[in-house]
């Protein structure tokens, strides 16, 4: 027979187990699949399947990150992680990147789109993602300790903002950025003009 103290301890442990299980399920519910690219070859660009038409970019030695539509929002999933690349026979580089590549995949969207970007951190240290050159709310700017806390290892952070200006931008970390960028953590962020006639592009 359990005494009162043992009963309370068992109840607390059970509640903690249930709440942690529920929390882990809810944190991953609805998370878009994280595409992974292991090939070093230039991949064919993704043609737009919804929304305004545009001429997608070809990323040399890279690829375009796929997205899914969720109630009118384009959802992407970036995974910050260690990456191994054989640069030449017997010469392996140990890099950091996104979704199996260093540098990371190109993100493409259209001016006026609302994007939601899930960033999962599989690095051995904290990170963030700064959307370089984009006009967005301060809380989405990705500067660790200033606009929001750094993303701890093993956690996912959600960035969400409207793309108000077209252009060629980039993304990179702003949490230990000197090390992380030197290790290869960066990628293109292309925002196509809503009106293709506004500024002709190749």
Q: Which ranges hold each PLM region?
A:
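Non-catalytic, glycine-rich low-complexity segments
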Residues: 65-68, 79, 193
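A short, structural micro-pattern
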Residues: 72, 183, 200-202
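Low-complexity, Pro/Ser/Thr- and charge-rich linker/hinge segments at domain boundaries
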Residues: 192-202
């Amino acid at each position: 027979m359990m005494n009162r103290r043992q009963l309370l301890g068992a109840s607390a442990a059970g509640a903690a187990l249930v709440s942690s299980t529920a929390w882990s399920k809810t944190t991953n519910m609805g998370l878009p699949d994280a595409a992974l690219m292991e090939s070093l070859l230039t991949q064919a660009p993704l043609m737009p399947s919804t929304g305004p038409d545009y001429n997608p970019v070809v990323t040399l030695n890279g690829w375009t990150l796929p997205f899914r539509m969720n109630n009118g929002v384009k959802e992407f999933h970036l995974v910050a992680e260690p990456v191994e690349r054989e640069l030449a026979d017997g010469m392996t580089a140990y890099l950091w990147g996104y979704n199996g590549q260093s540098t990371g995949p190109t993100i493409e969207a259209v001016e006026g789109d609302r994007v939601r970007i899930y960033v999962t951190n599989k690095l051995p240290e904290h990170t963030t993602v700064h959307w370089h050159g984009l006009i967005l709310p301060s809380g989405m700017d990705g500067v660790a300790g200033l606009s929001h806390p750094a993303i701890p290892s093993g956690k996912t952070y959600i960035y969400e903002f409207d793309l108000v200006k077209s252009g060629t931008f980039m993304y990179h970390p702003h949490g230990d950025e000197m090390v992380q960028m030197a290790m290869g953590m960066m990628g293109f962020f292309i925002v196509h003009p809503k009106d293709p006639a506004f500024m002709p592009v190749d």
